[in-house]
Amino acid sequence: MGLELVNAGNNLPEEINVIIEIPKDSEPVKYEVDKASGAIFVDRILSTPMRYPCNYGYVPNTLCGDGDPVDVMVVLPLPLVPGSVVRCRPVGVLQMKDEAGNDEKLLAVPVSKIFSGYSHIEDINQVSAHWLERIGHFFEHYKDLEKGKWVEIDGWGNATTAKQILTNAVQRYKDTLP
């Protein structure tokens, strides 16, 4: 089965499917899934020697204002394999901008069936402040040594904001279909 057959989720916006591109604690390599072939390409080697603090991927069949699918950071104590699909619940959003414009990233936890350790987390205020600081620090600095690239963090939004971003991105994707 190709990744193009994976939908955004069966219970949107409460649950989403996230296709993992970059595992938690991986080396500073930015991978991206080619949406047409499903192959995992090396996008670039990050100049800043930092490891991803969480699993990182996207919600298929969504489209943000930057032309990409919705980015998602999946909080888990373990790394996931690139190309794997994990069902998650959005609990917040890192609101940020970079040299290309707005670049929000949803924060999500796996559904309880996959990992019950975060079943109590429903909103961003229930996520450890330490985790939020680590994630924010990574994204604020991971482009520091790349010429012409920058990031500005605008703070964290709650689950309601994350779900609205997701709902808008699903509709934007549907609007592009013939």
Curated annotation (Swiss-Prot):
Mg(2+) 2 binds at residue 71. InterPro entries: Pyrophosphatase, Pyrophosphatase_sf. GO terms for molecular function: inorganic diphosphate phosphatase activity; magnesium ion binding. Keywords: Cytoplasm, Hydrolase, Magnesium, Metal-binding. It is found in: Cytoplasm. One of its GO terms (cellular component) is cytoplasm. GO terms for biological process: phosphate-containing compound metabolic process. Gene3D superfamilies: Inorganic pyrophosphatase. Substrate binds at residues 30, 44, 56, 142. It is an enzyme of class 3 (hydrolase). Mg(2+) 1 binds at residues 66, 71, 103. Its cofactor is Mg(2+). It catalyses: diphosphate + H2O = 2 phosphate + H(+). It comes from the Bacteria. Its EC number is 3.6.1.1. NCBIfam families: PRK01250.1 (NF002317). Homohexamer. Catalyzes the hydrolysis of inorganic pyrophosphate (PPi) forming two phosphate ions. Belongs to the PPase family. This is Inorganic pyrophosphatase. It comes from Xylella fastidiosa (strain Temecula1 / ATCC 700964). The gene is ppa.
